[in-house]
């Protein structure tokens, strides 16, 4: 299935010059969303995943159905102040500054094989920070899956040494 035909390109959003990839027009078609999810599930089964981890917010909508299909848990990675219990955190760079990502301190057991999911690989900063959180808790990043990769931003370079699946490339 050609998933790209279900992604809407929104010009000049959120700012001029950006060609935003809107995945809601993929997700609102059950058969297409299921197909995309199934592709990631097939990849994850080969990796013998124990847990799926995804950064907010679109990492949740990719990762939760994958975790459900695999029969494993899902651990959210959130911005600082959004998780209610004890967390570990990591600073990461944004285009114009820094932000902080957190995960519950007990979300991952040492040695667990983790699949990280997100909707989009752009610069790689969010996933690089997510990897740091997973590994700090003793998890093993067995794979990383995205719906879309923006190849011209070269985010894959920050993830060198990790196995990556992308379903679409722009």
Curated annotation (Swiss-Prot):
Catalytic activity: AMP + diphosphate = 5-phospho-alpha-D-ribose 1-diphosphate + adenine
Pathway(s) per entry: Purine metabolism; AMP biosynthesis via salvage pathway; AMP from adenine: step 1/1
InterPro entries xrefs: Ade_phspho_trans, PRibTrfase_dom, PRTase-like, UPRTase/APRTase
One BP annotation, GO: adenine salvage
Sorted UniProt keywords: Cytoplasm, Glycosyltransferase, Purine salvage, Transferase
A Pfam family reported for this protein in Swiss-Prot or TrEMBL: Pribosyltran
One annotated GO molecular function: adenine phosphoribosyltransferase activity
Cell compartment(s), UniProt: Cytoplasm
Subunit structure: Homodimer.
Primary role: Catalyzes a salvage reaction resulting in the formation of AMP, that is energically less costly than de novo synthesis.
NCBIfam families, A to Z: apt, PRK02304.1-2, PRK02304.1-3, PRK02304.1-5
Name of the protein described by the UniProt record: Adenine phosphoribosyltransferase
Protein species of origin: Bacillus licheniformis (strain ATCC 14580 / DSM 13 / JCM 2505 / CCUG 7422 / NBRC 12200 / NCIMB 9375 / NCTC 10341 / NRRL NRS-1264 / Gibson 46)
Annotated gene: apt
């Amino acid at each position: 299935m050609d998933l790209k035909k279900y992604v809407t390109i929104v010009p000049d959003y959120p700012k001029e010059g950006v060609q935003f990839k809107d995945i809601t027009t993929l997700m609102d078609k059950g058969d297409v969303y299921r197909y995309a999810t199934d592709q990631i599930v097939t990849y994850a089964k080969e990796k013998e995943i124990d847990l799926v981890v995804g950064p907010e917010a679109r990492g949740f909508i990719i990762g939760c159905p994958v975790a459900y299909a695999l029969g494993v848990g899902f651990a959210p990675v959130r911005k600082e102040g959004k998780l209610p219990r004890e967390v570990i955190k990591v600073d990461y760079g944004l285009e114009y500054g820094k932000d902080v990502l957190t995960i519950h301190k007990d979300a991952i057991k040492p040695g667990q094989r983790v699949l990280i999911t997100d909707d989009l690989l752009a610069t790689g900063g969010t996933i690089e920070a997510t990897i740091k959180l997973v590994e700090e808790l003793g998890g093993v990043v067995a794979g990383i899956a995205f719906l879309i990769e923006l190849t011209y931003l070269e985010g894959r370079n920050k993830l060198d040494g990790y196995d990556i699946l992308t379903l679409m490339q722009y």
